[in-house]
């Protein structure tokens, strides 16, 4: 019973609609009025009464996420079904029907179907694509509709253009997809065997194939190994024959066809023709030379007889020998026969494989699992060197001159080491001269205090000795030994071998050197020499800081005693001690294990840097002297400019700004002197208090005493070099850092 049409009982069914137009059902076709489409809806897109629209494509259930079109969501997704077809065979006694196997591909993106028939060897049937990709309609009377994904399942039959295909299975992807869209899958079916193909297979199992049907396919090997060559370095030792020698070869084995090529490595000035090819490319027999074969004896197939051919084909032919009687079997070298250490027969010549390249090693390691590639030397064993004996030194000239006179008929001068001279000769500020200060070891009281400068020239290993001149010493001083090489003592004078000379490695602080019978003990060295020795620790091991520290670490059991001794020596708690105190403590603790060179190396590492800057009062006095000479008094202008530049009113300006003002106002000071003066007034932020700076420079307001020239002769002290060596290499040593690095002691333990 329907409700009465009263307010509150009726509902507006047009709420939410946006389309209210009528569909155009009628039109013209070839100027004839007719119904254009029966599938068009009514007003607003609603279906007419009793109207059912058939879906044109597969309708998939909606899921979560974005609604992408089917041609995007199912791109490159294909359902694969296995099917077969019973094809009737007429007018043939061997078979009544034949089972043909097919692959049905359903493309989800546009509901197209493709049917392919896999290839069967020697089937005699057209195979490949049976139905090209297209939308396939239902069989009549529903041929106005097309197959969709819901029409496929396992163990069903589908009709494509009158041919019935029975689907018996599908791939796992197809099964999962059909389950997801709600299709209940049938159990897989069994595909029947083709009776004719089964009969042929059983027949072929009992057939003895003829040899002419053997395959000689070399294309696969050629494509796989083309351009890949095994290379071995080999040796043919022919030294046992008359005028024979050892000859080196390079063997190339071509993997694409198993051929071998050998090329000879010709050394320079060998006397042989410049023909590197020793064996042209070809297969190498293992047992050669085999002899001379008759024409046609070496063939791939043996021809039994020639016949005229079949009458219907009108073509000539030949019969091949099935049993190949009398065929010559040849055994050639393959890659399995080649290895390092193997000896191969190259047409009667024994060739030893000594080594191979990296590609060959990788090939054998990958294919055969070979890991031993120990090479064999191709070089001949070294002949014992005949030592040439020379007559002894005559005593005239140098040993090198006597040697050169014995080498040839015409005496030639000795060739010096020019490369060493060019590398180690002095240039610029680099002198390449090691200078040591030493004393003469003698029992004469007058010569005990004599100091000498021993210079070693690295360019030619020569030594010169110079004695500084001292007033009222009783010694003339000057050159003690001119520059020359010094022989080591204890050598025979007249001998055939060269004498040994003093080298740079034998000179270090604390060493005793015998120079032509005079014994010198090296006491100290200049700064360049110490730096050179520390930079070349491979030649001067006593200047190696790590080795010296390692000796002290061996005395770790005495660390507490060493700490107490240093603490007692540093009674002012300055954490530094003089060098002599540092040396005496270490020498007493190590009991002579360290030499002076090692002590100096350690002391230089922990030394207190000396400030070499000139006195500020001296700099101001020099600046006032220059201002007086140039009558420069305009210092108030500098302060006014600085106040103008100081926008933040801090009273300080950057150093570069004050330097720019000084240069722009032509302050009569040199660049280096001005930089030195500015550095003495700048703070850690590189800023200068301009009022203090220019007030100090104002020689009118703040005069200083006149600058006095230093005396010509200055009293000798430890810090000034006047021709005599300084008695100590460094002034103070930071012993606290030394104890922390060597023994791991902390500051609070002292």
Swiss-Prot record:
Pfam families: DM10_dom. The keyword Glycosyltransferase does not apply. Its main location: cytoplasm. SUPFAM superfamilies: EF-hand (SSF47473). PROSITE patterns: DM10. GO terms for biological process: cellular response to leukemia inhibitory factor; flagellated sperm motility. Residues 557-592 form the EF-hand domain. The keyword Cytoplasm applies. Keywords: Cell projection, Cilium, Cytoplasm, Cytoskeleton, Flagellum, Repeat. Residues 75-182, 226-368, 430-537 form the DM10 domain. GO terms for cellular component: axonemal A tubule inner sheath; axonemal microtubule; ciliary basal body; sperm flagellum. Transmembrane segments: none annotated. It is found in: Cytoplasm, Cytoskeleton, Cilium axoneme; Cytoplasm, Cytoskeleton, Flagellum axoneme. Microtubule inner protein component of sperm flagellar doublet microtubules. Microtubule inner protein (MIP) part of the dynein-decorated doublet microtubules (DMTs) in cilia axoneme, which is required for motile cilia beating. This is EF-hand domain-containing family member C2. It comes from Mus musculus. The lineage of its organism: Eukaryota, Metazoa, Chordata, Craniata, Vertebrata. The gene is Efhc2.
